[in-house]
């Protein structure tokens, strides 16, 4: 057996993992580098108020293998000028003239008003806006009325990446959920096409 008096349990324990729970979402940091995710999420919470995700229900995950460097995908997400050209359905669903980009420490925000008559999202009298947050370096939060979509961009190698979409909904009918997911699928396929074209041209 072991001499309990000579063994220090703290020398053999698992390494502690820093984490933060925010509106039922769990953020985990494995590296020792300083990054105050709580500060970032508190700012985001104020921006999107009164929206809260505590009562949203997890629906599903859709993953995509994309033949481009992960930074190309991030750059495409952060640049909204291509929307009227690459995403005609999305352009019809939003008020592109209201589209704005704001930058903060460790995250950025793109947001715009939604055209309720042509939007695939839940109709909301209190909030008809779409929020697109980028959390450095590779987490995206896409927020529309009644829906949260998180994106995790996972590098594979210099020429490819995985992108994981996780859907959360608040009291939405199944047909409305299908409409939302199908709409996102169309937009994602358009983004995949342009990202892979950019990669092939580098």
Tell where the protein language model's regions lie, with residue ranges.
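Long, hydrophobic, well-ordered secondary-structure blocks that form the structural core
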Residues: 1-18
């Amino acid at each position: 057996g072991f001499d309990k008096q000579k063994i220090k349990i703290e020398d053999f324990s698992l390494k502690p993992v820093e984490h933060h729970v925010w509106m039922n979402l769990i953020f985990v940091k494995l590296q020792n580098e300083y990054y105050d995710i709580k500060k970032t999420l508190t700012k985001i919470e104020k921006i999107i108020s009164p929206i809260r995700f505590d009562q949203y229900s997890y629906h599903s995950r859709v993953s995509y293998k994309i033949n481009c460097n992960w930074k190309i995908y991030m750059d495409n997400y952060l640049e909204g000028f291509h929307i009227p050209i690459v995403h005609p359905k999305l352009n019809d669903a939003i008020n592109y003239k209201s589209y704005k980009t704001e930058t903060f420490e460790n995250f950025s925000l793109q947001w715009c008003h939604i055209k309720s008559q042509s939007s695939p999202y839940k109709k909301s009298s209190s909030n008809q806006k779409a929020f697109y947050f980028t959390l450095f370096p590779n987490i995206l939060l896409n927020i529309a009325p009644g829906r949260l979509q998180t994106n995790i961009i996972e590098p594979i190698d210099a020429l490819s990446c995985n992108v994981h979409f996780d859907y959360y909904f608040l009291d939405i009918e199944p047909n409305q959920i299908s409409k939302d997911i199908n709409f996102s699928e169309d937009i994602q396929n358009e983004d995949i096409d342009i990202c892979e074209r950019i990669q092939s041209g580098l």
